[in-house]
């Protein structure tokens, strides 16, 4: 009987200690009124509805206006893994006729922050081959007005057009190559046996590291740009008599 009595007393004490505290036990000054949470939830819902209903063009324009206020540490460009010969930050436009063999140049006498070091190829060659033509015609230009791009995850992201580096506004340029014409000749690609092959020229892509918008901060992302023009072949069906 005594053992049962002690067991009941112990169970009662444990239940008393485990009982949830009432609001009267909460220290003064730490209670948050329910009206505050209701107002906060209403504000979040309103902001979410506005973000979903805002046109993409308006968002891009707002982001473009904020890029001048984004300051980037120049030491960030010293990391080799972030360098790309097809991405350039410069205060002046690159030359219109860019050389695809040497994308490393100096603008206005000052080297860009993300300049890479590659050996220059000689413009002269001891052997000249006459009558050589590319199967596809391509055009290469520096693009400085890119506002959106597709990242490596297939998501559309905002590209930073301009950034502030050492109190100077640098513009982000991308060296892109694309096909001039999908059919340089009537049969498709140049120099292809049209009797046995179907052919056409198409632009291919690659991913480069670029500065993009991540909320209100700049972030490095892999984005897709046009980088080459290649010939696509498919064998024609053989007609049997």
Swiss-Prot record:
Keyword annotations: Cleavage on pair of basic residues, Disulfide bond, Endosome, Glycoprotein, Growth factor, Lipid-binding, Metalloenzyme inhibitor, Metalloprotease inhibitor, Protease inhibitor, Secreted, Signal
Q: What's the subunit arrangement here?
A: Homodimer. The homodimer interacts with a single NTRK1 chain. The homodimer interacts with a single NGFR chain. The NGF dimer interacts with a single SORCS2 chain (via extracellular domain). The NGF precursor (proNGF) binds to a receptor complex formed by SORT1 and NGFR, which leads to NGF endocytosis. Both mature NGF and the immature NGF precursor (proNGF) interact with SORCS2 and with the heterodimer formed by SORCS2 and NGFR (via extracellular domains). The NGF precursor (proNGF) has much higher affinity for SORCS2 than mature NGF.
Predominant location category: secreted
Cellular component per GO? axon; dendrite; endosome lumen; extracellular space; synaptic vesicle
- Similarity comment: Belongs to the NGF-beta family.
Role according to the record = Nerve growth factor is important for the development and maintenance of the sympathetic and sensory nervous systems. Extracellular ligand for the NTRK1 and NGFR receptors, activates cellular signaling cascades to regulate neuronal proliferation, differentiation and survival. The immature NGF precursor (proNGF) functions as a ligand for the heterodimeric receptor formed by SORCS2 and NGFR, and activates cellular signaling cascades that lead to inactivation of RAC1 and/or RAC2, reorganization of the actin cytoskeleton and neuronal growth cone collapse.
GO-annotated molecular function: growth factor activity; lipid binding; metalloendopeptidase inhibitor activity; nerve growth factor receptor binding
Which PROSITE patterns does the entry link to? Answer: NGF_1 (PS00248), NGF_2 (PS50270)
SMART domains given in the database record: NGF
> Which residues of this UniProt protein bind a 1-acyl-sn-glycero-3-phospho-L-serine?
209
Xref: Gene3D superfamilies: Cystine-knot cytokines
Give me the glycosylation sites of this protein. Answer: 69, 114, 166
Protein name from the UniProt record: Beta-nerve growth factor
Q: Quick one: signal sequence residues?
A: 1-18
Query: Which residues are connected by disulfide bridges in this protein?
Result: 136-201, 179-229, 189-231
> Can you tell me which residues bind a 1-acyl-sn-glycero-3-phospho-(1D-myo-inositol)?
173, 209
Tell me, which GO biological process terms does this entry list? cell surface receptor protein tyrosine kinase signaling pathway; modulation of chemical synaptic transmission; negative regulation of neuron apoptotic process; nerve development; nerve growth factor signaling pathway; neuron projection morphogenesis
Proregion residues are 19-121
Location of this chain's protein in the cell: Secreted; Endosome lumen
């Amino acid at each position: 009987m005594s053992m049962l009595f002690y067991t009941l007393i112990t169970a009662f004490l444990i239940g008393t200690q485990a009982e949830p505290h009432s609001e009267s036990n909460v220290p003064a000054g730490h209670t948050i009124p329910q009206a505050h949470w209701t107002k906060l939830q209403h504000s979040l819902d309103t902001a979410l509805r506005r973000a979903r209903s805002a046109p993409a063009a308006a968002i891009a324009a707002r982001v473009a206006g904020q890029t001048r206020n984004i300051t980037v540490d120049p030491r960030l460009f010293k990391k080799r893994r972030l360098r790309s010969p097809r991405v350039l930050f410069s205060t002046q436009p690159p030359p219109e006729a860019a050389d695809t063999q040497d994308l490393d140049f100096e603008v206005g006498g000052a080297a860009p922050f993300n300049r890479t070091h590659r050996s220059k190829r000689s413009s002269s060659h001891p052997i000249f081959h006459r009558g050589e033509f590319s199967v596809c015609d391509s055009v290469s230009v520096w693009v400085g007005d890119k506002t959106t791009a597709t990242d490596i995850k297939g998501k559309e992201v905002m590209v930073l057009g301009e950034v502030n580096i050492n109190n100077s506004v640098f513009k982000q340029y991308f060296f892109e190559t694309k096909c001039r014409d999908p059919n340089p000749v009537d049969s498709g690609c140049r120099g292809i046996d049209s009797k046995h092959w179907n052919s056409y020229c198409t632009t291919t892509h690659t991913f480069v590291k670029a500065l993009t918008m991540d909320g209100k901060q700049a972030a490095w992302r892999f984005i897709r740009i046009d980088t080459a023009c290649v010939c696509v072949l498919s064998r024609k069906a053989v007609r049997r008599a």
